[in-house]
């Protein structure tokens, strides 16, 4: 049996360092790499598994995905996965303030970044402001 590969619109396997998202409420995000045997693997920080890890792409077979970030060159792709492997080696646990999107953002930019967390905090701020406005108008 052959390996499962995440591919682009032209059915070409995604390059090393490409980030993909699995559209859902939480927008799980992971990074593509290749194992020693050529099999595509995902580098991710998983809430379910509580820490960063390398997983077989088969785990996400038939799960819809979108390409969220693309490395600018093969060398950039290599640096991205090197940063991701360093985080996997460190093993810091998943938290709401250090999630899969932060993991990918740090691999790409060296800084945290989570669209989901930003959305939740933004929504909470709006709810708080509306609540304060409603309370002050009484």
Annotate the PLM regions.
Residues 3-68:
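Glycine-rich catalytic cores of cysteine/serine-nucleophile enzymes that process amide/ester linkages
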Residues 5-7, 59, 63, 72-75, ...:
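Amphipathic, alpha-helical segments enriched in basic
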Residues 48-50, 119-124:
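Charge-dense, low-complexity polyampholytic segments
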Residues 67-121:
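Active-site nucleophile-His-acid catalytic modules used for acyl/amide transfer and hydrolysis
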Residues 103, 125-128:
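Short amphipathic alpha-helical face segments that pack within enzyme cores
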Residues 114-120, 129-138:
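Short hydrophobic alpha-helical membrane-entry/anchor segments
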């Amino acid at each position: 049996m052959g390996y499962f590969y995440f591919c682009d619109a032209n059915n070409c396997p995604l390059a090393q360092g490409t980030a993909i998202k699995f559209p859902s409420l939480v927008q799980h995000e992971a990074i593509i790499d290749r194992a020693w045997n050529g099999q595509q693997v995902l580098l991710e920080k998983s809430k379910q598994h509580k820490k960063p890890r390398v997983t077989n792409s088969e785990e996400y077979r038939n799960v819809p995905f979108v390409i969220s970030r693309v490395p600018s060159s093969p060398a950039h792709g290599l640096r991205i996965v090197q940063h991701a492997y360093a985080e996997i080696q460190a093993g810091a646990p998943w938290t709401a303030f250090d999630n899969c999107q932060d993991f990918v953002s740090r691999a790409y930019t060296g800084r945290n970044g989570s669209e989901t967390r930003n959305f939740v905090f933004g929504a909470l701020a709006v709810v708080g402001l509306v609540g304060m406005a409603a309370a002050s108008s009484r």
